């Protein structure tokens, strides 16, 4: 099969490519860290225990909801995803609606946190943060917004301490960890497929070798959900946006969040992978915290 190539079109495409490359180089050259800051919504620290910090956001509108909302993200990422940038921010949207908003920051676990369990995070740190919000609001119960792994934390907490939870909202939260086992598209539930491909001893060796579950490893596993994008985003994907400053900064902010995935404390990671992903104990009613069924 012959392909006709118009030299004039080739020259035009090459000139356009060169122009975009030059514009992209200029934009990258002038971009500074302050231009790609994330989680910039004003807030103040109101409570701290070990590395866990509770923040309260500054109100921007008249309060329309009497019950404050505590946002709880997981340990496999950072809460900053909920406040990525001014025009793409769950936090700013909730504040604009008059919600009294708090967020939990789990900090950056190190090898010194290797022995922390899910009980430590749910029954101690999360419980302490909820207690602080209750004290500040003068209420006995508050609303919880759980995101990803944080949704499992809040779900377990609500099941064990229902008197402290007025409303529970979950988003992108796994409950049936084997829901993808049959009939789901290949890219759905990849973390579950990966974790179930490991033996219990594999997980033990992984944690013992590293102390924690490495954030870099989880970033790689997540990237396998969209392998083509993972291979092309730094060439084709970046090229598509590099001459548009707004799109380029959006791209860089997302990459900044993706590359800042903290390690997951070792013992808590064992529970997360074994009890939940491998054995699906939560939906079976077999999951235990502190020796008690959730």
Where are the language model's segments positioned?
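Conserved catalytic-core motifs of eukaryotic protein kinase domains, centered on the activation segment
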Residues: 113-115, 181
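Alpha/beta-hydrolase fold catalytic core
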Residues: 27-52, 238-294
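N-terminal targeting or regulatory segments adjacent to alpha/beta-hydrolase or S9 domains
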Residues: 1-39
């Amino acid at each position: 099969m012959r392909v006709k190539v118009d030299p004039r079109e080739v020259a035009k495409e090459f000139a356009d490519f060169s122009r975009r490359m030059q514009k992209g180089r200029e934009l990258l050259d002038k971009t500074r860290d302050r231009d790609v800051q994330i989680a910039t919504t004003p807030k103040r620290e109101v409570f701290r225990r070990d590395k866990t910090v509770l923040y309260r956001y500054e109100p921007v509108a008249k309060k329309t909801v009497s019950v404050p909302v505590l946002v709880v993200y997981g340990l496999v990422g950072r809460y900053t995803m909920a406040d990525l940038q001014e025009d793409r921010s769950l936090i700013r949207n909730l504040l604009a609606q008059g919600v009294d908003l708090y967020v939990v920051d789990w900090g950056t676990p190190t090898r010194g946190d290797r022995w922390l369990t899910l009980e430590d995070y749910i029954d101690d740190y999360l419980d302490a943060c909820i207690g602080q919000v209750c004290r500040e609001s003068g209420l006995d119960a508050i609303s919880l917004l759980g995101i990803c792994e944080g949704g499992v934390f809040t779900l377990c907490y609500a099941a064990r301490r229902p008197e402290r939870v007025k409303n529970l909202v979950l988003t992108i939260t796994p409950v049936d960890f084997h829901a993808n086992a049959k009939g789901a598209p290949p890219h759905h539930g990849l973390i579950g497929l990966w974790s179930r491909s490991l033996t219990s001893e594999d997980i033990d060796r992984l944690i013992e070798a590293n102390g924690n579950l490495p954030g870099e490893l989880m970033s790689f596993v997540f990237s396998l959900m969209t392998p083509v994008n993972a291979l092309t985003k730094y060439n084709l994907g970046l090229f598509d946006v590099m001459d548009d400053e707004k799109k380029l900064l959006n791209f860089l902010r997302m990459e900044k969040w993706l590359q800042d995935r903290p390690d997951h404390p070792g013992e808590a990671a064992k529970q997360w992978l074994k009890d939940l992903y491998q054995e699906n104990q939560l939906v079976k009613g077999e999951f235990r915290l502190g020796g008690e069924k959730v």
